[in-house]
């Protein structure tokens, strides 16, 4: 299959599984294989793991381009998500992309925000006042029609007030908007996203607050990154995924692949987590009731941890027999 999702609990060897998968594909002559981590720190961990098990790999040197060992499909290239997913990617965008045999996203849930941010431009009023002011002026009349008071608060720099530019105003003024962004494209806040937005401006929306302006797509165009989108094999690995829907609408995965991830059949805990606010479920479940009930529960089959804001807040738990540190 082209796409594969692997869910393994933390500590079950996801990294080694991923490295072995890519090495197997290299041995099968599937083409260059790319291992993508959420950040630079985890790149070092994966490299250490590969070195420990004798799996050949290569990394980016600071002053060189894409390693020849990767392009020749001799070694796995290990890098971080920001290196691949940005408008100035060394792997190319649009039609000028580097062909790959397999791309693996490790801790894929942690990579999602980075991929989304690659398509987003955030213009700070403090760091880039000129561009911010031009955009604010461009849509000033449209904002007044929505809410004159809110528009005045934004002009005054209120952090908590924001407005969305109506899509019809955005579409009518997209040419003027492109001229503003093009003139400022060398700015660090615009530079990396500009190649992705310049020909897709119609598919973006704009949010304006008193401190910044954010321009984001309705949905990311993952096909702009051909090295990932058109790889022969795409593998996502994670202990848990909070936003599986993004794999379909964002990464263009088949829904059936997302519904049927590869799991360890003997695994008792999936790694998925649930956050519950008891008082929103049942009004009678106030703080004192929850603390009392939980402290009286048997912990022979599972552990229980309570995080409190201060030492003073520990006393209620101490009185009920909890161990505090």
Residue ranges of each PLM-predicted region?
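Conserved Walker A/P-loop ATP-binding site and its immediately adjacent core
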Residues: 12-62, 83-86, 243, 305-315
């Amino acid at each position: 299959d082209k796409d594969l999702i692997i869910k393994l609990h933390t500590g079950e060897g996801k990294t080694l599984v991923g490295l072995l998968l890519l090495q197997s594909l290299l041995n099968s002559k599937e083409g260059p294989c790319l291992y993508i981590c959420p950040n630079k720190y985890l790149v070092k961990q994966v490299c250490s793991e590969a070195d420990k098990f004798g799996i050949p790999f290569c990394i980016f040197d600071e002053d060189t381009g894409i390693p020849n060992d990767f392009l020749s499909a001799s070694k796995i290239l290990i890098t971080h998500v920001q290196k691949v997913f940005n408008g100035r990617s060394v792997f190319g965008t649009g039609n000028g992309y580097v062909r790959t045999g397999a791309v693996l996203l490790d801790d894929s849930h942690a990579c999602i925000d980075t991929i989304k941010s690659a398509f987003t431009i955030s213009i700070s009023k403090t760091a880039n006042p000129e561009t911010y002011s031009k955009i604010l002026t461009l849509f000033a009349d449209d904002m007044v029609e929505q809410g004159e008071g809110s528009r005045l608060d934004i002009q005054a720099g209120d952090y908590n007030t924001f407005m969305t530019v109506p899509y019809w105003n955005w579409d009518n003024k997209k040419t003027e908007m492109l001229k503003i962004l093009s003139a400022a494209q060398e700015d660090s806040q615009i530079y990396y996203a500009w190649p992705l937005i310049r020909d897709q401006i119609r598919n973006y929306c704009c949010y304006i607050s008193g401190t910044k302006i954010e321009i984001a797509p309705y949905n990311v165009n993952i096909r702009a990154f051909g090295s990932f989108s058109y790889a022969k094999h795409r593998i996502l690995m994670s202990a848990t995924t909070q936003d599986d829907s993004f794999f379909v609408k964002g990464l263009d995965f088949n829904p059936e692949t997302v519904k049927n991830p590869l799991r360890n059949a003997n695994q008792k805990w999936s790694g998925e987590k649930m956050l519950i606010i008891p008082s929103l479920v049942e009004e009678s479940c106030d703080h004192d009731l929850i603390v009392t009930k939980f402290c009286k529960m048997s912990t022979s089959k599972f552990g229980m941890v309570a995080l409190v804001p201060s030492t003073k807040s520990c006393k209620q738990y101490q009185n009920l027999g909890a161990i505090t540190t």
